[in-house]
Amino acid sequence: MDTPSPDPLPSPLPGEEEKPLALSPPVPRGRRGRRPGGATSSNRTLKASLPRKRGRPPKSGQEPPLVQVQGVTAPVGSSGGSDLLLIDDQGVPYTVSEGSAAGPEGSGPRKAPHFCPVCLRAFPYLSDLERHSISHSELKPHQCKVCGKTFKRSSHLRRHCNIHAGLRPFRCPLCPRRFREAGELAHHHRVHSGERPYQCPICRLRFTEANTLRRHAKRKHPEAMGVPLCAPDPGSEPPWDEEGIPATAGAEEEEETEGKGEPA
């Protein structure tokens, strides 16, 4: 059986010329198939229309929101006073002065510090204040499983566990000695550098450690235990001379020498 042949293409009419098909140029696309100026611009517009976080002063022309704090309702940034009642990210209200809340022009409000009620130390974030409050607490929740000793912080427990494990991770680069803590290594460096930052104000001897200076003062100068051991004080007793040595030092030795006298 013969297969029918396809119909031939119609020939152009006389007087007409064949023209190529006109294709539109491809539309450029951004990354991930986004058209430039399309979804990105709409996202930016959407973000700009979203409300800002709590704690920022309202724009001019808008009524400030009301905040309920201990039964007292006060508008944030009200013109009745120079203080601003704000709320941080944790939902805790705090009051700052209008001058301190506004930072440099165009930088927005500056976060007010949180003060420790015990030592009045200031912290920029509430989490830092909560971490600091552990030092004033008597609780020691971290306990060593070997000896049962308790600690306030987990870092102190990890450092203590190095004693039972025999680990000394801090090694001196100048000698083979190793230490459990970085502070011990820093003190050991004074042996190689010759640094003696602690000086006796009476005999002017210098020491590497503060404990060594205290032992020296108890043994050599028991009568001057009330004298400051770090630096001479011109207003303290006994009086200090220009070199920082007590003016009465050595007076008893001179009296003993004069009392004996030379043999006749």
Curated annotation (Swiss-Prot):
Residue ranges of the annotated DNA-binding region, renumbered to this chain: 51-63
UniProt keyword annotation of DNA-binding present: yes
Keywords from the UniProt entry: DNA-binding, Metal-binding, Nucleus, Repeat, Transcription, Transcription regulation, Zinc, Zinc-finger
ZnF (C2H2-type) residues: 114-136, 142-164, 170-192, 198-221
Alphabetized SUPFAM superfamilies for the sequence: beta-beta-alpha zinc fingers (SSF57667)
GO biological process, one term: regulation of transcription by RNA polymerase II
Role summary: May be involved in transcriptional regulation.
Protein name: Zinc finger protein 524
Native species: Homo sapiens
Gene that specifies this protein: ZNF524
